[in-house]
Amino acid sequence: MDLHRAAFKMENSSYLPNPLASPALMVLASTAEASRDASIPCQQPRPFGVPVSVDKDVHIPFTNGSYTFASMYHRQGGVPGTFANRDFPPSLLHLHPQFAPPNLDCTPISMLNHSGVGAFRPFASTEDRESYQSAFTPAKRLKNCHDTESPHLRFSDADGKEYDFGTQLPSSSPGSLKVDDTGKKIFAVSGLISDREASSSPEDRNDRCKKKAAALFDSQAPICPICQVLLRPSELQEHMEQELEQLAQLPASKNSLLKDAMAPGTPKSLLLSASIKREGESPTASPHSSATDDLHHSDRYQTFLRVRANRQTRLNARIGKMKRRKQDEGQREGSCMAEDDAADIEHENSNRFEEYEWCGQKRIRATTLLEGGFRGSGFVMCSGKENPDSDADLDVDGDDTLEYGKPQYTEADVIPCTGEEPGEAKEREALRGAVLNGGPPSTRITPEFSKWASDEMPSTSNGESSKQEAMQKTCKNSDIEKITEDSAVTTFEALKARVRELERQLSRGDRYKCLICMDSYSMPLTSIQCWHVHCEECWLRTLGAKKLCPQCYTITAPGDLRRIYL
């Protein structure tokens, strides 16, 4: 058998960009030529370097001599009927390019074309390339792998021929066994399957396929959605019945708890704790779900329930108080309305049929027969009954004694005005006497000390003398007592007091002046009605003419005047 002609084609080598550097050379047998006649003598390969036979030692591209290919790969035994007497490492057929010698062209080595993807068969087209899965993703099962009785194997050699095993023939037929054995032999030669799989019987392969299928289905084992327990197919019916029984027992247990909680005399705190515990319990609780129980009975969830219950209790208490207030108000309104209705009914009954006697005969007043009496007939009538909303508590004058003290002036202190006609003067005097009730008039201000003394009666003396007298009277202070001619010391002290008063007036600059007499205040008074300030004489003379403030015309009585100090 020519092992070199089909094994090496250096012209199409994809792993030797440079000329051959190493003197070592490997000669391998292809799978396609493995089925040929072994009696054909081996031919020498084309001269591309130093020819090396199969019997020579293979060059190992590792520095350590003890690290051999035998330690990396196990030698494969001979396959009956193909390579009985050959002793070469068949595991080198699927050696990865990184571990191959640098001068070896592995392009046409049977189905293991390293120009593609190393130890796998060459990609014929894009569809074949896409059909293979990545080494980092789970392997996909073929459609025919679900049927353990019909194994499906595909194989392609270096020439592009594909072999399909187990597609048409059943596994029990001898033809299928023959094809399966042939495929196993080819895969054994190529090194893709182990000796145990190649030499195993069809029954062993079927058992292994069933185990693989069971292992695959174990990853998809059913899980109970309630208690999260892995179940076997034989346990599904029993577990479902158990869950249904637990579900039927839940309402009965809750009803018993509610009946116990609603028993008379149960405190609200116990009811609240029972409700919190009932809400905290999971409806899907089971002895197998300890993780879910811990989650639902966590401290955080219990705190949330307690806070929510306390908040609802406070809100309910407020609502209850509001309802009680509304009920009390409604009862009060109802009682008031009932009393009013009863009073109206009594009043109507008392006045419905009014009887009176006339000429010894009892008669019924016709107006009482009308509904509403005179009011119903359109007449306006005054009720003889006193109105409860009278003005008895209304104080029109007001009592300012507590706030402003006792009155300091009365009607007797008012200075009456003198009219030009004697008739008017008499009328004023009579009116004043009636107001005073025969009391004596006040001597608070005498004509001698009055600012307005020059206005009383016209003088018959010289004008100069009258002016001088007026000046003297104007400049006189009311606080200074009448000075006698004999007391010189008293006169001296009075003059000093007057000088000091004038100095104070000059120092103030006459900032405060009465708006009536346009002079400095001799004795300022204010009214508690409008709080305007005038001289005492100005106030009393104004109130003698009219009971109004001379500045704002507010009604003012003598009792409203109060003394102030500037």
From Swiss-Prot:
The modification Phosphoserine is found at residue 390. Its main location: cytoplasm. The gene is RNF220. This is E3 ubiquitin-protein ligase RNF220. CDD domains: RING-HC_RNF220 (cd16563). GO terms for cellular component: cytoplasm. GO terms for biological process: positive regulation of canonical Wnt signaling pathway; protein autoubiquitination; protein ubiquitination. InterPro entries: E3_ubiq-ligase_RNF220-like, RNF220_mid, RNF220_RING, Znf_RING, Znf_RING/FYVE/PHD.
